[in-house]
C-alpha cells in the first residue's frame, strides 16, 4: 500500500512538471511574466486549486474501472501508475504535450484488462472519450470567437497600449489557468489513491480523505515548480506566435473549460488538450497559415496514442509485477 501511495505521488509530481507549462507557457511567451515568477505563481495556484473539489476524483476512482477488494488489485493500481509515469516521461523527453490525465486513465484501463478487473466502458465513453473530443473543439471555437471579439472591440485602439494592458491582464488569466490545472489534475491522483485505499480494504466508501488531498496538492505544486521547459517552448512558440491579447484569450478560454468540466460534469479532461486547442483558436484569427499545423499534427498524434500506449505499458508492468510472488 505504501508503494502505491509513493508511486501515486510520484505520478502527481511528474504531472506537475509535465503539465506546468500548460498554465504559464503563453504568459512567458508574450513576456507578461518572467519564467521564474510564472513558475512560482503556477505552483501556488495549483496548490490552491487542489482543495476546490473532489468530483473529478470520484469519477477517476470509481467511474472508470471496477476492481475486487484484494491485495492483487493494489498491483493493478501500481501498474496503472507506472504505465502513466512511463508515458509521461517519454513524451516529456521528446517535448510532446500529451495528456497526463489520459495517460493515467489509459494506465488504469490497460492494467485492469490485463488482470481480473472490469472496465466500465460506458463510464469511459461518457466521462473520458466524449470530453476528450469535445473539450479541444470547444476550446478552439470559444478562443477563436473571444479573440475575434477582442480584435473588434480594440480595432481603433493604440496597439502598444492594448498590448501593455493585456500583458497585465495575462497575470490574472495565467493564474486562473493554473488554478484550473490544480482543480483538475490533483483530483486525478486523489482518485487513484482513494481507489487503492478502497481495494486494499483500508476504507469502505469512496470518500477522499483530507490527508490524500494535502499530499496530492503538495506533490503537484512541487512538480509544477520543477517546471517543464521543453513543453513550454512547444506550446508558447512553436504552435503559433502569440501576442498578449491572444495569450489572454487562450488562457481565459482554457480556464473556463476546465472549471465547467470539473464543477458541472465532474469529467477528467486534459489541461494540455484544452490550452493547446485554445492557442490554435486564437492563432487562427490571424490567418490559418499562422498556426504551424505540422507541429499541431505532431501533438494530435501524441494525443491519439496516449491512452492505448499508456495502457500497453501498464499491462506490461502488471505482468512483470505478477512475476514476483510477494505481490
Regions found by a protein language model. Give the residues of each.
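Multi-pass alpha-helical transmembrane bundle typical of ion/small-solute transporters
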Residues: 1-327
Amino acid at each position: 500500500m505504501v508503494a502505491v501511495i509513493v508511486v501515486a505521488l510520484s505520478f502527481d509530481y511528474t504531472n506537475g512538471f509535465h503539465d506546468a507549462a500548460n498554465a504559464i507557457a503563453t504568459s512567458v511567451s508574450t513576456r507578461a511574466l518572467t519564467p521564474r515568477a510564472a513558475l512560482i505563481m503556477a505552483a501556488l495556484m495549483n496548490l490552491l486549486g487542489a482543495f476546490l473539489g473532489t468530483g473529478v476524483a470520484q469519477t477517476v476512482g470509481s467511474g472508470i474501472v471496477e476492481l475486487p477488494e484484494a491485495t492483487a488489485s493494489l498491483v493493478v493500481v501500481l501498474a496503472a501508475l507506472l504505465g502513466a509515469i512511463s508515458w509521461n516521461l517519454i513524451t516529456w523527453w521528446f517535448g510532446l504535450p500529451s495528456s497526463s490525465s489520459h495517460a493515467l486513465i489509459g494506465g488504469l484501463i490497460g492494467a485492469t484488462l490485463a488482470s481480473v478487473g472490469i472496465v466500465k466502458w460506458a463510464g469511459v465513453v461518457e466521462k473520458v472519450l466524449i470530453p476528450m473530443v469535445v473539450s479541444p473543439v470547444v476550446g478552439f471555437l470559444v478562443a477563436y470567437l473571444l479573440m475575434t471579439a477582442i480584435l473588434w472591440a480594440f480595432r481603433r485602439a493604440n496597439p502598444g497600449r492594448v498590448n501593455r494592458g493585456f500583458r497585465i491582464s495575462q497575470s490574472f488569466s495565467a493564474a486562473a489557468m493554473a488554478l484550473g490545472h490544480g482543480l483538475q489534475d490533483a483530483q486525478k491522483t486523489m482518485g487513484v489513491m482513494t481507489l487503492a485505499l478502497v481495494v486494499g480494504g483500508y476504507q469502505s466508501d469512496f470518500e477522499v480523505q483530507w490527508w490524500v488531498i494535502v499530499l496530492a496538492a503538495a506533490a503537484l505544486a512541487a512538480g509544477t515548480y520543477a517546471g517543464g521547459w521543453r513543453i513550454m517552448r512547444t506550446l508558447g512558440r512553436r504552435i503559433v506566435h502569440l501576442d498578449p491579447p491572444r495569450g489572454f484569450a487562450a488562457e481565459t478560454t482554457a480556464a473556463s473549460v476546465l472549471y465547467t468540466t470539473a464543477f458541472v460534469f465532474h469529467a477528467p479532461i486534459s489541461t494540455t488538450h484544452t490550452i493547446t486547442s485554445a492557442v490554435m483558436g486564437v492563432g487562427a484569427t490571424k490567418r490559418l497559415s499562422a498556426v504551424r499545423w505540422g507541429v499541431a499534427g505532431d501533438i494530435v498524434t501524441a494525443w491519439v496514442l496516449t491512452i492505448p500506449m499508456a495502457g500497453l505499458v501498464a499491462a506490461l508492468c502488471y505482468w512483470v509485477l505478477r512475476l514476483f510472488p510477494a505481490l
